[in-house]
UniProtKB/Swiss-Prot annotation:
This is Protein PSK SIMULATOR 2. Promotes seedling growth probably via the regulation of phytosulfokine (PSK) signaling; PSK are peptide phytohormones acting as growth factors. Involved in PSK-induced root growth. Together with PSI1 and PSI3, required during vegetative growth and reproduction. GO terms for biological process: positive regulation of growth; response to peptide hormone. One of its GO terms (molecular function) is translation elongation factor activity. Residues 512-529 have a biased composition (Polar residues). One of its GO terms (cellular component) is nucleus. The keyword Protein biosynthesis applies. Residues 16-59, 506-529 are annotated as: Disordered. It comes from Arabidopsis thaliana. The gene is PSI2. InterPro entries: DUF3475 (IPR021864), DUF668 (IPR007700), PSI1/2/3 (IPR045021). The keyword Nucleus applies.
């Protein structure tokens, strides 16, 4: 009977399914999406012969069990109206997403347009909550702020006066770079524009990283400032006030940089201590662990407080707004001071080989500093210093050095102080250029550079001081290569004469005041014969204090001590009554040699070269 009932139920189910499919097709649906109209409860449930209700299968994979009503599935908590609301909410979310996409496209197109009103300092005060915090970019932003502060400080009135009156008219700059003042002004303007391009490039990069789309593509806005002379002029006080705020935040960020390094060291010590305790199976409540935990907690609190005060917690859009104002002010200041100079290469610069363009400025700076170090102490030098210096010389200097050294014998001999005085005439102004070049190459923009040097802005800096960063005209960057080669050649020749004179003075040879070439009738005495002569002594070369010290050392009588390796117990007497030392264990393996018959004085004469019997 149960089998018959089940068959009847199956036939009824098939008929109802076919009827529902026909209704869906008549409405225009393929069966994948059902009708959104509210259906009756009889469509979803049907009554069986036992007075119970059964649920229709809504999925093709769902199996309909033909059990009694007692074990039938529970009626659903949601009806078709809730399903309809879900479908509507899904369509609503899709519409919102499409609308947001359209808004983003319009924002991108709007940001690419350069219709920005500069009358309000580049949309001043218009910030978005989508900008986000600076967080880990704080250190890179602080490095950029340090560069901007240095550039803005170099454009102050005092530094500009120093550059125009002193630097451009300096004799040293004219010797190395050019004697044309106009060309020097063009080089100075191009340097400032290049520094500005580097600074603004980083601001553009940060703007593209901002979530607020109005700060994207800032390069087009800066190009508009160059091509179109904007009537709006940002006041100097406003730009300096914004820069002062940024410098204050950057200074706190530098403290955060150092404290984060200290926190990393504390964490490493704590982990190392924990590993040590675990390896020894000791409890974690020791005194050392507790101390490290307290230090680690205090350091974390300090780091969190600095993060709140520094660039870490600032809004990136607000920082970019201030940086854009600073870039705009620097651009208009460069135009006011230098005009159109430095915008394109000058025709007078063609044909000049500059050290900076060739990438040789740092190499020549090291050469000059090495020559200065050798000249300061020529008598105490390692053996490989001269070879290292010679190998580092340029090819043009090496080629011209050999004929110059061959003509030294015909020149007048000078003393060591005289040679040093001649070298000092060139080194006293070349060495500062070399030191500035080395300093400029050491600061190549790494993230922690600003943290190791204190950032100062607008605090009465002296003339020519640019946060410790020299300008390129104060380095070897624009120096003419043939001119520098000639100075290096002269210094190397003087250095050769200095080394030669220092060696002669060290061997006790007194230089003649006139020509050092002796007449042919006089016999030249070599240094070796002078040193081996019995009448020769070094005491006439020593001062009174050195002689007294030498006599005191020679008067000390040294007594022989007992060696533990030889096991010398004491003195023994032979048959004749002479005291002898006990022999060591190693002396028994050596053959005995009788030296009583030989004359020791003749051997010493042969060694000293005073015995002429074999000549």
């Amino acid at each position: 009977m149960g089998g018959v009932c089940s068959c009847v139920f199956k036939d009824d189910d098939k008929k109802k399914k076919l009827r529902s499919n026909d209704d869906d097709k008549s409405r225009g649906f393929s069966g994948k999406l059902k009708s959104m109209r509210r259906s009756k409860t009889s469509d979803s449930y049907y009554s069986d012969n036992y007075g119970g209700s059964r649920r229709k299968s809504s999925k093709p994979d769902e199996v309909v069990f033909n059990f009694s009503g007692e074990l039938g599935p529970m009626p659903p908590l949601r009806n078709d109206s809730t399903k309809f609301m879900q479908r509507n909410s899904f369509m609503g979310r899709a519409g919102v997403m499409g609308l947001e996409k359209a808004v983003e496209v319009l924002d991108t197109l709007g940001s690419s347009m350069t219709r920005m009103n500069p009358s309000n300092a580049y949309l001043s005060g218009v910030t978005s909550s989508r900008g986000g915090k600076v967080t880990i970019l704080a250190f890179e932003v602080a490095n950029t702020i340090a560069k901007g502060a240095a550039l803005l400080q170099s454009l102050s009135e005092e530094n500009l006066k120093f550059m125009k009156k002193d630097m451009l008219h300096s004799e040293e700059v004219k010797k190395l770079v050019s004697t044309d003042t106009t060309e020097l002004q063009i080089l100075a303007a191009s340097d400032k524009r290049e520094e500005l391009d580097l600074f603004s490039g980083e601001v553009i990069r940060f703007g593209n990283m901002c979530k607020d789309l109005q700060w994207h593509n800032l390069d087009r806005y800066f190009m508009k400032l160059d091509t179109e002379n904007s009537q709006h002029k940002l006041l100097k006080d406003d730009a300096e006030a914004r820069m002062q705020e940024l410098v204050t935040l950057a200074r706190i960020t530098s403290e955060l940089y150092h404290e984060l390094q200290a926190l990393d060291r504390f964490e490493q010590d704590y982990r190392r201590k924990l590993a040590e305790v675990e390896s020894l199976n000791l409890p974690r409540r020791g005194e050392g662990i507790v101390i490290l935990q307290n230090e680690l907690k205090q350091q974390k609190k300090l780091v969190k407080s600095l993060q709140k005060k520094s660039l870490w917690s600032q809004n990136l859009a607000e920082i970019i707004e201030k940086l854009v104002d600073v870039v705009s002010y620097i651009r208009q200041t460069i135009v006011e001071v230098f005009g159109n100079n430095g915008l394109r290469d000058n025709e007078g610069e063609q044909g000049r080989e500059r050290l900076g363009e060739a990438g040789l400025s740092l190499h020549y700076a090291n050469l000059i500093q090495q020559i200065d170090n050798i000249a300061s102490r020529p008598s105490s030098l390692p053996s490989n210093v001269r070879d290292t210096l010679y190998n580092a010389l340029p090819a043009t200097v090496k080629t011209a050095l050999r004929p110059r050294l061959q003509t030294l014998d015909q020149e007048e001999e000078l003393s060591v102080p005289e040679i040093k005085a001649e070298m000092e005439k060139s080194l006293q102004w070349l060495v500062p250029f070399a030191e500035n070049t080395t300093k400029a190459h050491q600061g190549f923009g790494w993230v922690g550079e600003w943290a190791n040097s204190r950032i100062e802005f607008g605090k009465g800096k002296g003339k020519g001081e640019n946060n410790g960063n020299p300008t390129r005209l104060q380095t070897l960057h624009h120096a003419d290569k043939p001119i520098v080669d000639s100075y290096v050649l002269e210094l190397v020749v003087w250095l050769h004469r200095l080394m030669k004179s220092s060696k002669k003075r060290a061997h006790g040879v007194k230089l003649q005041e006139t020509n050092h070439v002796s007449p042919p009738n006089n016999r030249t005495i070599s240094n070796t014969q002078l040193s081996l002569s019995p009448d020769f002594t070094y005491k006439n070369q020593l001062s009174l204090e050195d002689r007294l010290l030498l006599d005191r050392v020679q008067s000390i009588r040294f007594g022989p001590n007992l060696s533990k390796s030889q096991e010398l117990v004491g003195l023994k007497k032979n048959k004749k009554g002479f005291k002898i030392w006990a022999l060591s264990r190693s002396t028994g393996n050596s053959p005995k040699v009788d030296l009583s018959d030989k004359n020791s004085s003749s051997d010493l004469d042969v060694l000293d070269g005073l015995d002429f019997a074999f000549q």
